[in-house]
Amino acid sequence: MDFSKLRPLACGLWLAVFGSAGLSQNVSPATDFKSGPGNGWYSFASSSPATVIDLIQSSRARPAATTQAELFLPPNLPKDVKSAAVVLVHGSGGVYPELTTYWAKLLNAQGIAAFVIDVFGPRGVKSTAEDQSQVTFASDTADAFAALGMLASHPQIDPKRIAVMGFSRGGITAVRSGAVPIIKGAAPAGLRFAAHIALYSGGCAGMLSVTPKPGAFSPEPMLFVHGDEDDYAYLSDCRTYAQRISAAGTPAELVALPGTRHKFDLDSPKRVNLPLSTKTKEGCPLEYDLLDLKARDRRSGEALSADKVKEISKELCDAKGASVEGNRSARDAAGKAVIDFLKKTLAV
């Protein structure tokens, strides 16, 4: 999905549907969670890398940043019990209510902690829908790894049972945080996510997708959940992506939801059209190989020059117009798929 340069009308519609992230009240600064703090908002150190290469190559500049996240521990968790946990990464509209009112509650009901990141608020951004360059995609991933490190230090969280779950733009981080070069370059020492979940994910095609090949991804399993009527990020692209990731050696499954559009986890069933929103055309052949840092045409495997990338983008990838629509029955089906996956992967 190409999220860049939504026009004002589309941005306004987007914000009406998604809400916007902002600086939260009563945020407690923390360097770690060793004291075992309870539920609430916490701010902690992260970074704002400019590109994915800056994530991979630790010698490159990574400007210091502060991020924040809201912690939801399962109710009545015994002090001597370590729970599994999930880091939730929002999309272009920032943190939206259903992340906490639906997803965090669903996870808590299964005895799983939830840590909902606000990537945008501490960086002074409400939404990147109109201009994705306001916050780099690499910053999302840096924040997810920072959250992993915080959770791993909590005495009631099992550091080996922490998953990441991303929504739309956040799905890009959910997938890329499983890429071996990114783990080696940016994950906290000795840590990695135990599972990766991408809901109506961006980045299944185009330059934000990772070339799936042996050695590109870690062995930790992936789950994609996607609507078959999603016209913002296409099911066919995510299905192909999951199949190629599996073929390269990382277990990846996809659950398709019939009659379901983008942003199906919203409470509101009202369909909102975003006629000026930019996106990636179905079947865009571009991808990025993290093992040799080259743009490629996935049809041929050919490495591409910057000029060729621009040419293909213009001809086969850049497009406008999409829609979003809440669907509670689809959301419940997605919730079941997520919990079933976590039961298998995190032993909950």
Each language-model region and where it sits:
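Serine-hydrolase catalytic machinery in alpha/beta-hydrolase-like enzymes
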Residues: I56-T67, N76, K82-S153, E315-S323
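C-terminal catalytic histidine-bearing segment of alpha/beta-hydrolase fold enzymes
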Residues: P251-V348
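N-terminal cap/lid segment of alpha/beta-hydrolase-fold proteins
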Residues: V27-V81
